[in-house]
Amino acid sequence: MKKFLIQTLFVFSSALFAQDKINQFDEKGLRHGVWKGYHDESKRPRYEGTFEHGKEKGVFKYFDDTKAGTVIATRDFSKGDGSCYIVVFDQKGNKVSEGLVVNKVYEGEWKYYHKESKDIMTIEFYKAGKLNGTRKVYYKNKNLAEEVVYKDGLKNGICKTYNENGKLIEDLNFVNDKLEGKAVYYDGTGSKLYEGNNKGGAKVGNWKFYENGKVVKEVKAEKFSKELAKYEEKRMKALANTQKEGKK
């Protein structure tokens, strides 16, 4: 009985000692060693990772607030330069997004994935937390949906959108987040619908409307919206009639 009591006390004290080794500070009051955080209400594990005199070290894991405690994100500080590589997961373990954070802002390439898929939905590039370079968005069939050039977080350059079959829908240009220069819009088959020019985000000059590859109307920029409404109504009626004919 005495021997059993001693063993029990040893196990209990060992457990307490192990707990004492978690969430500790160094002599300067900086977090040091293994740290674990918990969800406020459930008290389930929220994260775990290691600090070295106040600095994150290695891989930190973050858990959802369920009994399963699924890993929903990791932050890798292995470079030791203060940066961390973040990977976000859904509750089935599929990647949602991943990329680098430096000084608490996005840096370099970031990837976003289609739901429950390894296929990339969006690729974008950051410099000091701002979008820079070409941002691309993809359909689930892997065809390009959109490509936009950014500089310092603003659209600067080409902006093209495509349908799921890879046909160009819009061919635009931006300067400091405002439409500038020639803009061309297409239908789903690659034929022009209308085109014109922009300046400082506003339509200028004459705008042309097309049917079957030929110009059918040309209007001043200030009359574009009114003409567009009539043009689209005409297109919808023509499309509806075509569909009716196809059902006969």
Regions found by a protein language model. Give the residues of each.
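Bacterial Sec-dependent N-terminal signal peptides
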Residues: 1-23
